[in-house]
Amino acid sequence: MDLTGEQSRLINKFVQDWSIDERLELETTFGVRGVVDSNTFLQIAQRLRTKGYQEIPQEDRLNIITPNNIRFTLQGLGILQEYCNDDTLDNKIFTAMFKDRAFPDSNIDIHEYNIRFKMRREEELSRTDPRIQELLKTWNTQRKAFRLIRRWSFEGKGIRMDLSMVRQTTNVPGKGEYQWSSTFLERSVLSEIPRYEVEVELLHHTPFTDTPDKALKTLISGVGEIQRAIQKNTLLI
């Protein structure tokens, strides 16, 4: 995989910043607008299993996203079914997170390969956080987008690959934002055509990512593994 000097410089800068701030998430997505086709998705899963990556079981999850970049996550089929029926977080276990771009230029697009490196800042929020409490008070009228996710995760040395089949709220045509709704059923998420998404995420606090140089090698190695599966080739083209 050939990169320009500027692309290499920017990726190096991402890794340097990621290495000194554990709130930062550095990941890579694949395909046009972050989506691959189902055959490519299966090719990637098969390669990761063949190469001995550790498969990590995942429960189905529902991400509920608000316009102010707060994401609620429910996990487990039973809880998801309950939410679909009652549209409330009352008496349900959930996690919450504030997630946004780390800085204005937080995407690096490698158009020749349909790859995007992206940096995001994450902040876990407790149920008692004032921002969460305010949202819960007016939950019935809050604008929301929904992502119903079935995920297969594979972990390697300092890296995790997430392969996700996603049904989600559609975007406004010609824009990058969701068609917000106040209830799950309002946008018929269950009837949406699934999207197939593949992400490579660099993991903090591992012996393979504890210096910027090691983290960069780990990231490029993981991206290369996915690219080989996409290209159906043992050598990167």
What residue ranges belong to the model's regions?
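Phosphate-end processing signature that detects enzymes handling 5′-triphosphorylated RNA
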Residues: 1-237
